[in-house]
Regions:
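Switch/coupling subdomain of P-loop NTPase systems
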Residues: 2, 9-13
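C-terminal effector/interaction modules appended to NTPase cores
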Residues: 2-3, 76
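Short beta-alpha junctions and helix-cap segments that line functional grooves
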Residues: 3-5, 98, 126, 242-244, ...
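Surface-exposed, interaction-prone regions with an acidic/low-complexity signature
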Residues: 4, 17, 251
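Primarily NTPase-proximal linker/entry elements flanking Walker-type ATP/GTP-binding cores
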Residues: 15-16, 20-144, 149-185, 189-194
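Conserved catalytic-core segment of NTP-binding enzymes
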Residues: 152, 172-187, 201-310
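Short hydrophobic/aromatic patches at helix-to-coil boundaries
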Residues: 195, 311-312
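Short glycine-rich anion-binding loops that position phosphate/pyrophosphate groups of nucleotides
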Residues: 197-199
Length: 312
């Protein structure tokens, strides 16, 4: 089993989850490159195909420019050789600078995002994933603004087999998360995963609320580490990224969970996320099941979408 539990099961799930993307626009990219000679027409067509795959104009131009440089540096002649270089360039574009920091006592993951993106189910799936990694996980029902939020999370917590700390509707989210971190610390839990209100905030309110939550985490346990993961819906692609830019800055997000990747043929938005938001994709959702959230690896992603053509 590889890094973060990325073994055969996860590889198979990624393969199945990316089926629409692989046979859609990315299939067109492979067809564009396979059997082609490398010239300006090829670069133009490749740029167009990358944009159609939802990579975004800026990233498409950047990738094609870098590919052109690589082709010239290495004296490459065929589209197959170019596709292998493109594969490596895409993986480089998405590679995180560092792994997630789960070193704290406890580690805390704050999950943020607007309603409808799959935030609550992502929390349950994260809980299931880390439980399978041998960690003791506790959930915090920090979305106290929506009556159904904690009930929904409670159902998922039962499915994942993890405890949930909740309070009544309208309770202070920072207080709920404080209590959860306190409880987790006292009971020797490794990880707290906290839900937050899934509504569109104005920037000032969002910053104030999340800043208060961050302080409450450290107050409850000075040894805690904190990651803030923003959930985005892959089906809305570039639109989701545009809406998320200010949200990310205000929330001081550290990574992305990209859900519903199995429901789109345009999975290229994965490539755009890091460039446009400056944040790495940490997990991808590839199905409805509780074990259908898998850790994202750039290498695994390109392996499925752009299989290596040229044997070096």
């Amino acid at each position: 089993m590889g890094l973060f539990g990325f073994g055969k099961k996860e590889k198979d799930k990624m393969k199945d989850g990316l089926e629409k993307t692989r046979t859609g626009f990315w299939g067109n990219i492979m067809n564009t490159l396979t059997g082609s000679k490398i010239d300006d027409d090829l670069y133009d067509e490749l740029e167009e195909q990358l944009i159609l795959a939802d990579v975004g104009g800026e990233v498409a131009i950047k990738l094609v420019d870098k590919l052109r440089d690589r082709v010239n540096e290495k004296w490459l002649k065929t589209g197959e050789q170019a596709s292998d270089e493109l594969r490596d360039l895409i993986a480089d574009e998405m590679r995180p600078e560092a792994e997630m920091d789960l070193s704290g006592t406890p580690a805390v993951i704050l999950v943020i995002g607007v309603n409808g993106v799959g935030k609550t189910t992502s929390i349950a799936k994260l809980a299931d994933f880390y439980t399978r990694q041998g960690k003791k996980v506790m959930l915090a029902a920090g979305d106290t603004f929506r009556a159904a939020a904690s009930e929904q999370l409670e159902i998922w917590a039962d499915r994942a087999g993890v405890p949930l700390v909740k309070a009544g509707e309208g309770a202070d989210p920072a207080a709920v998360i404080f209590d959860t971190v306190k409880s987790a610390t006292a009971r020797g839990y490794d990880l707290v995963i906290a839900d937050t209100a899934g509504r569109l905030h104005n920037k000032a309110n969002l910053m104030a609320e999340l800043s208060k939550i961050s302080r409450s985490v450290k107050k409850a346990s000075p040894e805690a580490s904190l990651e803030t993961l923003l959930v985005l819906d892959a089906i809305t692609g570039q639109n989701a990224i545009s809406q998320a830019r200010e949200f990310c800055k205000a929330a001081n997000a550290t990574g992305i969970i990209l859900t519903k990747l199995d429901g789109t043929a345009k999975g290229g938005c994965v490539v755009a996320v890091k460039q446009r938001l400056g944040l790495p994709v940490r997990f991808i959702g590839v199905g409805e099941g509780i074990d259908d959230l898998i850790p994202f690896t750039p290498e695994g992603y390109v392996e499925e979408l752009l299989p290596r053509q040229w044997k070096h």
